[in-house]
Amino acid sequence: MGIKGPLLSGALGSAPTLAAVLRWTEGRSPVVVIGPPWLGDAVATAGRVLVLVEPEVRPVALRARRRAHKQSRALDVALAAAELPLGRATLPALVVENVGGLQDDEAARWLAALVPCLRPGGRLIAADATSSTAAAARVAGAFLSAALSEIVQEWPRDGALLTIGVAPTASIVAARFGAPTAVDELLPGEPRNFK
């Protein structure tokens, strides 16, 4: 039996869904997870993970980190708003939760802020707890608006949708999202605050 999330994690925490997430992140490290700590902990079974959480979730995330470290898993925790250490073109993979729960314009803005953090060819994986084909279409549209390519949608089980996209080349990122800042040019690949 594979890994699974906590009892009340629903379809996203099911063994088939987490196995699919691990398949899409395989060979990519570090992986940044913006979502619940248990999702970051599950992904950390296969490699180094940084989970970004809201301040109210930090105590739970720190407990997950301690458990992961006891089991020799590389899981780190940072606050999403204050400590977002994502530089431009630095991430091989990014897992986010609940893109389908956002309004269209919010989803487009959020993905437009995240895509430049991916390396060219890096993967963005959105995990959504939904059975709605309309929500799946909205997520795919948000991925298209963020210039992601090779978009795939997978339903590992009923009620769980994964949407996967590949980050564009640096020239497309510059054209779509603007040129790198002076800090990006001076310190390529170094973590820095993302605003």
Features from the language model and the residues they span:
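A generic alpha-to-beta junction signature in SAM-dependent methyltransferases
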Residues: 25, 44, 117-119
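Core SAM-dependent methyltransferase catalytic element
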Residues: 152-195
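A short glycine-rich, Lys/Arg-flanked "PGG" loop and its adjoining helix->strand segment in the class I
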Residues: 106-123
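Conserved alpha-helix/loop element of class I SAM-dependent methyltransferases that forms part
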Residues: 3-30, 38-42
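Conserved Class I S-adenosyl-L-methionine
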Residues: 131, 135-159
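A short acidic, Gly/Pro-enriched loop at the edge of an enzyme's catalytic core
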Residues: 83-96
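Class I SAM-dependent methyltransferase SAM/SAH-binding core
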Residues: 36-82
